[in-house]
Design a protein with these regions (language model features):
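Glycine-rich segments within core transmembrane alpha-helices of 12-TM secondary carriers
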Residues: 48-67, 266-274
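Helix-to-loop junctions at the C-terminal end of transmembrane segments
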Residues: 183-196, 282
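Intracellular juxtamembrane helix-capping segments at the cytosolic ends
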Residues: 27-41, 238-251
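C-terminal membrane-cytosol helix-exit motif in multi-pass small-molecule transporters
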Residues: 67-68, 72, 90-115, 304-308
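Juxtamembrane intracellular "pre-TM" segments in multi-pass secondary transporters
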Residues: 105-140
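Hydrophobic core of transmembrane alpha-helices in multi-pass small-molecule transporters
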Residues: 12-27, 224-238
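Pair of pore-lining "gating" transmembrane helices in MFS-fold secondary transporters
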Residues: 20, 130-151, 230
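C-terminal ends and interior cores of transmembrane alpha-helices
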Residues: 1-9, 206-219
Length: 315
């Protein structure tokens, strides 16, 4: 409502404040992946996370294709056409709230707190790597987010600057977004089967390959840039699913929600830093250098996840 009012009144301050509040919905949407894992056994936890992640793809694809029809709806109501999507999203948020209040009972997080701690009564997933802890999980997702946002943000600008149309740039981004979420069921199976650490390393390698491909792609090659962005999305997916599973495994149930919230704040800040700094980097040293720098950052995930947390013993 605030965004629509800001658009109608041509009030930038109101619009910005409303958009900040609107962002809370996106944060809740991302947090939903943790809720999917609250009651999952360790052996199926990553698959539970991935199921929620792939559901967000449906909304993303549908929303991206509603711009024109919702614009017609807004115009019919005497509102600016671009407010149409916010009319629909407001209704969708309200419906989601009703679903949560009516059907999410009992709250899976509260129910999980009444169950025995992980490792006592519940089976441990093969390859769960208990040496990994919360800091590693946060670092995996943080570096993944920084690399993905930085390269993704500047790729359309790079394409437009070299003569490609908005249609080509839009197609590349659409393929990228699809690769971010559609592989989630497969990612969940891989994480549960081969372990959090292995797929986190796979995320780093995939992101690095994507970065090298983006840096070396000829300026007139939409196909290679699209392939680079697809791999970038896939690497992000691997990192997000494995990092989420690492954190959920390591955090005690009593403090898990706080830990998960802290992780997502770090991810959001990292994404903002990656997005804002990417433009300055491209202006200073170019898009290929930005991509290669992103690849180096991604490879920092490997030593982070291969380093086990030191165990302390008491005599």
């Amino acid at each position: 409502a605030g965004i629509i009012a800001g658009a109608v009144l041509d009030n930038t301050v109101l619009t910005v404040v409303a958009l900040i509040l609107y962002g809370a919905g996106a944060a809740a949407n991302l947090q939903a992946r943790y809720a999917g894992a609250d009651l999952a056994t360790p052996a199926r936890r990553a698959r539970a996370v991935s199921t929620v992640l792939v559901a967000t793809t449906l909304g993303g694809v549908a929303g991206a294709n509603l711009t024109a029809p919702t614009g017609v709806l807004a115009a019919a109501l005497g509102l600016p056409p671009l407010t149409g999507l916010f009319l629909v999203s407001g209704a969708a948020y309200a419906l989601a709230a009703v679903v949560l209040v009516v059907w999410l009972r009992p709250d899976p997080f509260l129910l999980a707190r009444t169950l025995p701690p992980d490792g006592q009564a519940r089976p441990v997933a093969a390859g769960s790597e208990h040496g990994l802890g919360v800091p590693q999980g946060i670092l995996v997702m943080l570096l993944t987010q920084i690399v993905m946002i930085a390269i993704m943000t500047m790729t359309p600008i790079h394409m437009l600057g070299h003569g490609h149309g908005t249609g080509a740039a839009g197609l590349v981004i659409a393929l990228h977004v699809g690769a971010m979420f559609l592989p989630s069921p497969l990612s969940g199976i891989l994480v549960d089967r081969y372990g959090r650490r292995a797929i986190a390393v796979a995320a780093a390698v995939t992101l690095a390959v994507a970065a090298v491909l983006a840096a070396s792609a000829p300026e007139d090659s939409v196909v290679l840039l699209a392939l680079a962005l697809i791999l970038l999305g896939l690497g992000w997916n691997f990192g997000m699913v494995s990092g989420t599973a690492i954190i959920t495994d390591a955090a005690p149930v009593a403090t898990r929600a706080k830990t998960q919230g802290t992780a997502d704040v770090a991810i959001a800040i990292g994404g903002a830093v990656g997005g804002m700094s990417s433009g300055f980097i491209v202006v200073g040293i170019g898009y290929p250098a930005l991509a290669l720098l992103g690849g180096l950052i991604a490879l920092a995930i490997v030593p982070a996840v291969l380093r086990r947390v030191a165990r302390t013993t008491t005599s």
